[in-house]
Amino acid sequence: MWLIAGLGNPGSQYRNNRHNIGFMAVDAVYQSFSFSPWSKKFQAEISNGFINNEKVFLIKPQTFMNLSGQAIGEALRFYKLDLKNLIIIYDELDLSPGRVRIKIGGGNNGHNGIKSIDAHCGTDYCRIRIGIGHPGSKELVHQHVLGNFTKFDQEWLSPLLDALAKNIALLIKGDKSLFMNEVSQTIKNKNLL
């Protein structure tokens, strides 16, 4: 069993924000496979289905970014899942827009959603970091992450989310390298970045 969590903020005013790319990615997975309708549980929206015969729960915490760990921690405990069966998808300031990196464990790099998950769950889980770029100065970070994706961003955003969703089964099978290769190749082949 797996839990795939996308980080973001609830509410229509945040829907297209850079900070909500985790929600967008989980929505892309939801649309790519057969999942149950979204329901409310664990202070989150949650859905379940199967990817490669593995039971998977998708979760979008509705606690706002800084408290994401509360919802994810509740779900992990309820389903008795280990951190090795948790995948978190979120925005990363220190990666160029559209770049993707994956790692197990590590620090939070100042990301408040990750800080919350680390505090409530521990640190040894899979992280898919999607680059949103840095605005250049610390004073502009808040405005940048809560700003909407630009028209230029839309050119890489949809294909990237589609590639993540279509290849997530590789990650569930434990093939991180092939997952990264497939996602990177999709972006490269489309000359998006």
From Swiss-Prot:
Keyword field: Cytoplasm, Hydrolase, RNA-binding, tRNA-binding
Site feature: Discriminates between blocked and unblocked aminoacyl-tRNA: N9
Cellular component, GO annotation: cytoplasm
Gene Ontology terms: biological process: protein quality control for misfolded or incompletely synthesized proteins; rescue of stalled ribosome
GO molecular function: peptidyl-tRNA hydrolase activity; tRNA binding
Residue spans crossing the bilayer: none
Matches recorded under InterPro entries: Pept_tRNA_hydro (IPR001328), Pept_tRNA_hydro_CS (IPR018171), Pept_tRNA_hydro_sf (IPR036416)
Catalytic activity of the protein: an N-acyl-L-alpha-aminoacyl-tRNA + H2O = an N-acyl-L-amino acid + a tRNA + H(+)
Residues marked Stabilizes the basic form of H active site to accept a proton (site): D91
Cited SUPFAM superfamilies: Peptidyl-tRNA hydrolase-like
Gene3D superfamilies: Peptidyl-tRNA hydrolase
Subcellular location: Cytoplasm
Homology family: Belongs to the PTH family.
Subunit structure and binding partners: Monomer.
Name of the protein this chain belongs to: Peptidyl-tRNA hydrolase
Gene assigned in the entry: pth
